Design a protein with these regions (language model features):
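Glycine-rich phosphate/oxyanion-binding loops and their immediately adjacent helices
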Residues: 34
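Conserved acid/base catalytic micro-environments in cytosolic active-site loops
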Residues: 2-5, 11-22, 26, 37-45, ...
Length: 336
């Protein structure tokens, strides 16, 4: 069973979280804490697999508690917060939390949210907290002479920090447009864009239907919309779709990758990073089969080795690299 510690100053919230966890036999609540200081003590006492962490609490907030826990007793932390403090939630992710999930109105009749909530906790429980990075020189064999017109990045659990690390050294004049599909909830996409903008030199915005992607610009798929593209005289225009979810996900990486394969073929560079599940595996294979280039994050640096693994097992990977080398390879390709 997955051992869960609930941290929230609201007794009502704690009770409802317990009820949601009780709908599955996969989870065991090993403790409840009502402020950040208590959460540190309970973490050391109960040794949970996952901590569900609120942000706004007395004594010590969830942000400071996350920093201390990740320093003293690293544990998978799922930030469970309201939209008005979502920006702080991404700071918590930067401090080491695995994922973020907005609090609903606690309507237990919403089975979809309950399933999403349980999926997030299960995904967090699989997180690799001590990731290894190799900062060595990029080998010549890892380079490619292909020229690309679009970079498409797909990720889920652990994605915000992975993308931040990937893009942090990209110059503002990076010569290729970048599209990102990050599994994200409604109400949090704009906060994600704002946070990512503060972490890199490139322009970052939510993708807009009909927009022409520009070099040095990052376009993020909005929550609950698939990001696709269609051919145009300029190369392509971005499209947002309400097509059904894939793997219960919208936006889905598979949808973006398959669209990129159709429009750009061999001119597409795809990157599949950390995340639970198989989303992106089929789409990555489509890009590879069309002549494009697919980079998959290796197991050693993935927070959750699921999506990247699916692509590798499908035979879609052109290169399998640790996170820090992916950024170096993309920059090397762009400079050529």
């Amino acid at each position: 069973m997955i051992k869960v510690l609930i941290v929230d100053d609201s007794m009502v919230a704690c009770g409802i979280v317990k009820q949601m966890l009780g709908t599955s036999d996969k989870f065991e609540v090993v403790g409840v804490a009502h402020d950040g200081k208590e959460s540190i003590i309970k973490t050391k006492e109960t040794k949970p697999d996952v901590i569900i962490m609120d942000i706004n609490m007395p004594e010590m907030d969830g942000l400071e508690a996350t920093r201390i826990i990740m320093k003293e007793c690293p544990t998978a932390i799922l930030v469970f917060t309201t939209e008005d403090v979502a920006r702080v939630g991404y700071t918590a992710i930067e401090a080491g939390a695995v994922d973020i999930l907005p609090k609903p109105d606690f309507d237990l009749k919403d089975d979809r949210f309950t399933q999403l909530f349980l999926h997030k906790i299960e995904s967090a429980s699989k997180a690799l907290l001590e990731r290894k990075f190799d900062n060595g020189v990029l080998e010549v064999s890892e380079k490619t002479d292909q020229k690309f017109k679009i970079v498409c990045i797909g990720t889920s659990t652990g994605g915000p920090v992975a993308v931040q690390n990937l893009l942090k050294d990209f110059p503002e004049d990076f010569p290729i447009p970048i599209l990102i599909t990050q599994h994200i909830e409604v109400g949090f996409d704009s906060h994600y864009v704002s946070w990512l903008s503060s972490c890199c030199k490139l322009k970052v915005s939510l993708a807009v239907d009909g927009e022409v992607p520009q070099p040095g610009h990052i376009y993020v798929a909005p929550a609950d919309k698939h990001l696709t593209m269609s051919p145009a005289a300029s190369g392509c225009v971005l499209r947002l779709s309400d097509e059904p979810p894939v793997f219960f996900l919208r936006p889905a990486v598979d949808v973006m990758f398959k669209s990129a394969a159709q429009v750009f073929k061999q001119d597409c560079l795809a990157v599949l990073l950390t995340g639970m599940g198989k989303d992106g595996g089929e789409g990555a294979k489509s890009i590879k089969d069309a002549g494009g280039f697919v980079i998959c994050e290796s197991e050693e640096t993935c927070v959750v080795y699921g999506m990247s693994r699916a692509a590798i097992e499908a035979g879609a990977a052109s290169r399998i690299l640790p996170l820090d080398k992916i950024g170096k390879l993309i920059l090397s390709i762009a400079q050529n």
